[in-house]
Amino acid sequence: MFACLALVPFHAGAQPTGAKDSSLQAVPELPYRVVPNFFKFPKGMTPGETSGVAVNSKGHIFLFQRTRPMLAEYDQNGNFVQGLGEGLFSHPHGLRIDADDNLWTTDDGSHLVLKLDPSGNVLLVLGRINTGAEADWLFNKPADVAFGKNGEIYVADGYGNSRVVKFDRNGNYLKSWGKYGLGIGEFNLPHTVAVDRDGRVYVGDRENQRIQIFDSEGNFLRQWTGIGYPYGLVISPDQHVWMTDGGYDRIIELDQEGKILGAFGEPGHQPGQMAWAHFMAIGPDQTIYVADVLNWRFQAFARTAPTGRMAKYIPSARMFWGSAPSVGWASRQTVIPFK
């Protein structure tokens, strides 16, 4: 059973204890329960800080972590299958799997985005190792990667460059958009990116606490604010947007209009609680997998029957079309921790 979400956020730059936010609302508690000790790690292995997680077409789960093996495959029952990509990674960050079951990693230590086949062989390198953004096609601590319906590659070049970079399916640079800032089309740490079936690009503008939505050419369409801190985004087959909120340590489901449909989770160290909910993935049976950074673990949450309970007090989403919101972005903390 999940406890109600706390009013006090588990985030250094968020609302102070005792502060009140008139936008807070109660929403349905999503029907998920934690599956304790789902992953059976090899003897002697501790995950360390966890970062990325993804699921392939067979339901196998791939975990990206900051201890060896940094990239590992587990079957649908949580049993270890193999380690992959030994020696390829510096500081693992994001992990995605494309329609052909290729693995894509973002590494904010080496400034690289890698495409690997299911056996861990390198197929494509974007960026240049240990080189920041000296050219349009280079990155400065890239955070996440996503794919368009025609194979386009979108990189959230997050920690250093505050932009989105677009490549064609073969890795040729096409364009980029965004810069550091608070306005429309600007970012304060674009930490995650996802693309829906219509080609719209969703960017989790983490420290501005919003999701900005663009067309495939980077033209601004709208934004959703008041949703917390978007650390990771996943778009489900029904086109709902799922978000890890690493500031309040919860999982949120939104519809295509930006309405919050439900949430679950809370900050803490017990099973089912989280400390920096980073990235997430959804399995074919609707199990949700979460990289729980500071707890040094990956957690699995199984879907259950609806409970009818409410997950109390999360920010209400507000959608803006083509204009900036009238909220105090300038008051936000701008020192960005690497997480």
Regions found by a protein language model. Give the residues of each.
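Bacterial N-terminal signal peptides
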Residues: M1-P9
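Hydrophobic single-pass membrane-insertion segments
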Residues: H11-G13
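Eukaryotic scaffold repeat domains enriched in small/polar residues
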Residues: Q15-K339
